[in-house]
Amino acid sequence: MSKNILVCVAWPYASGSRHLGHIGGAYLPADIFARYHRLIGNRVVMVSGSDVHGTPITVRADNEGVEPIEIVNKYHKEFLGYWDKLNIQWDNYTTTMTDNHKKVTQEMFLKIKENGLIEKNKSIQAYDPIENKFLPDRYVEGECPKCNYLEARGDQCDSCGVTLDPEELINPKSKLNGNKAEFKETEHYFLKLSALNDQLSEWLNSKKGWRPHVINFSKSFVEEGLQDRAITRDLDWGVDIPNNELGDGKKIYVWFEAVIGYLSATKEWASNMGDPELWKDFWLDENSESYYFVGKDNVPFHAIIWPSMLMAYGDLNLPTNVPANQYILIKGEKASASRGVGKTLNDYLDEWNPDSLRYALGSILPEQNDSEISENEMIRRNNEELVAAWGNLVQRVFSQYINNFDNLDFDFELIDVDKNILDQANTCFEKTGQFIEKVELKSALQTVMSFVNKINAYLNETEPWKVIKKDNKRGTAILYSALTSIDACASMFTPFMPSTSQMVKNAIVRNTQNNWELNEIKKGAELKNIGHLFKKFD
């Protein structure tokens, strides 16, 4: 029986070009996971969109002397190009600027307020006396009080991952001019996280199979006691506060509003499908599953704050899993768009076949620990694994099959060595599927590539290019078994490398059309020559 699978992916700030860390951290893993579940017959909705209200956008707009909307339009368009080139298959990729998103955000705000878990309170907020304005959290930088990282932001430390308020920073400075930030009292709406502490703790303790760094961080954070958190700010760029009692110059703050995008994007998808009620299948059905693909800096917002908001709202499904990835490191430093660490994604897309790039990233996904990446290692994996192992396997079996087609005799019997390689194909399907369902995608990819090496070993042992010259039936049996195994690999590679895998599958004629099981290749059918799948880097 098929399941409803909601795949929620981090909303990128529409403030700058993306890099490999973003793709390997969230977007590629989500796409692999979603593609697999579609293949096995589950009903999948994968949603995200460009976050247009994040303060990095206004920071960039200020620096460039333009309006925020100009920055948003530029980078949202650029992001759409990424997804197209990388074959990221969204059911809905939208923005937080739509009327639908604003409506859903305001409805959630009012419902939580009605439930008694949003209230007005006074807070101290960073203020720039020279500019005579309150500073959004990301306009403040200083030393982290936890790990002493010198470039911590007013909302979070990129080094240790702790969420912060600007007043907690040591020597806080305004990013507008580098001068010392002052702090003044202002009134805002607060989410009463403290009232949800016990409920959230109980829920976290019930979760099984989460990545250790995600569950351990989340439990530790909650054990310290959740503090009520302001969900509005003194801003002129953001979603309006409904029934605002605070006065002008305040908006709903982005950390509260952006995560609501998962719900608003699903509702938008349902409307696009012609049935506005379809979203309920993924948010109200208790058998539906939801997975949140984010980087580790987003763990507090997706494993703590968003579940708290859902609890405060009531009735909506809580996350099934938050398989957050660690960081991809460039020479030991976290890739960062805002700090210019690492080549942009466009740099790689200009040079790499998208499937080669997906494979290189998929093979080093930082699922448990930070992963160091270098272009030399990516090139090695492309040349040795894609070109020399997988691509060469396809090429030599296809060429032997096509060149000897007139002499093939399909009235053959398989012997033990042939049956063994096909049994291994069945085992590979099972193991690979199990790894993907546990969101252990790197292990899944390694499992398929290991099977590729076993097929190559099978060919080296059986030598069909020699056997076919003196025993047509035996040579045909070997090539048929190898081709069946290649078809299986193409199926299993499909979530990781959809374009080249489909090329292989389109060339093969089958009696069956299984997506995640061994297929029966049609005996006597011609095979299409597809040429080289991948290019070798010098």
Question: Language-model segments: what does each one mean?
Answer:
Residues M1-W203:
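N-terminal, positively charged nucleic-acid-binding surface of large information/translation enzymes
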Residues R138-L150, F293, E372-L386, T427-Q446:
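Extended, non-catalytic structural segments that build the interaction scaffolds
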Residues V104-K111, A258-G261, A389-Q400, K431, ...:
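Alpha-helical scaffold segments in carbohydrate-active enzymes
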Residues M1-G41, V45-S48, N100-V104, I170-N403, ...:
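Structured secondary-structure scaffolds
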Residues M1-N4, V45, N121-E131, G142-G161, ...:
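Basic, alpha-helical terminal appendages of large translation-related enzymes
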Residues P68, V214-I215, I379, L386, ...:
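Residue-level recognition of alpha-helical structural elements
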Residues V299, L361, L365-Q368, S374, ...:
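Active-site-proximal binding-pocket segments
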Residues I32, E70, K74-G81, E107, ...:
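A non-catalytic, amphipathic alpha-helix used as a structural packing/dimerization or gating element
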